C-alpha cells in the first residue's frame, strides 16, 4: 500500500474477529515499535504483549475499551530511561505516542486493525500485569483482524481544513 493511501484509509477498529494474529505479524509490529524515533534515541518504550485468554480477561478488569480483541499490547515507558528536557519535562509519553503511531500504521498495512485506548484504570493495570514501578503505562492497543461488519466511523473523513489547524510564524488573536 502506498504511504498516502495508508494514512487516509487507516481507521480506528473497535470490532474484531476471533482470528488469532500470527506470530510473524506480531513480530513485524514490534519491529515497527523498535525502529520508531524517540527523544535522543533513548528508546524508553516498553511493550507488554497480551494474547493469553486469561490475561485478556484481566485486561477487561482494567478498561471497558478492550473491544474483545484477540491481542492487546500495553505500551509503557521506563522513566529511568526516558529523556527529560532542560525544564525537566518527561518525554516518555510523547515517545510512546510516536511508537504507537508507527505500530498502528504497520498493523493496518498488514491487514490488521487497532485503536488507541487511553482510558483505563491505571492502578489496576499495574497490579494485574505486575508492571514495574519505574514503568509508566500510557496506552493499550487492542489488535486483531477487523470483523466483516467493521467500517470507519462517521467522523473518519471529517477533517478540518489546513487553515484551521496551521498558522505561520506566530499566532494571531482569536486563533
Where do the protein language model's features map onto the residues?
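Acidic, surface-exposed loops and disordered segments
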Residues: 1-175
Amino acid at each position: 500500500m502506498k504511504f498516502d493511501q495508508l494514512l487516509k484509509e487507516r481507521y480506528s477498529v473497535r470490532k474484531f474477529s476471533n482470528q488469532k494474529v500470527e506470530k510473524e505479524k506480531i513480530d513485524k509490529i514490534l519491529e515497527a515499535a523498535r525502529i520508531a524515533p524517540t527523544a535522543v534515541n533513548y528508546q524508553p518504550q516498553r511493550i507488554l504483549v497480551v494474547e493469553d485468554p486469561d490475561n485478556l480477561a484481566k485486561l477487561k478488569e482494567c478498561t471497558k475499551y478492550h473491544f474483545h480483541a484477540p491481542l492487546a499490547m500495553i505500551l509503557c515507558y521506563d522513566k529511568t530511561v526516558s529523556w527529560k528536557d532542560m525544564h525537566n519535562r518527561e518525554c516518555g509519553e510523547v515517545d510512546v505516542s510516536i511508537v504507537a503511531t508507527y505500530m498502528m500504521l504497520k498493523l493496518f498495512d498488514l491487514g490488521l486493525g487497532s485503536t488507541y485506548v487511553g482510558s483505563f484504570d491505571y492502578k489496576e493495570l499495574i497490579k494485574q500485569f505486575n508492571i514495574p514501578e519505574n514503568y509508566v503505562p500510557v496506552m493499550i492497543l487492542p489488535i486483531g483482524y477487523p470483523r466483516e461488519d467493521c467500517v470507519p466511523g462517521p467522523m473518519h473523513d471529517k477533517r478540518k481544513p489546513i487553515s484551521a489547524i496551521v498558522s505561520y510564524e506566530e499566532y494571531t488573536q482569536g486563533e
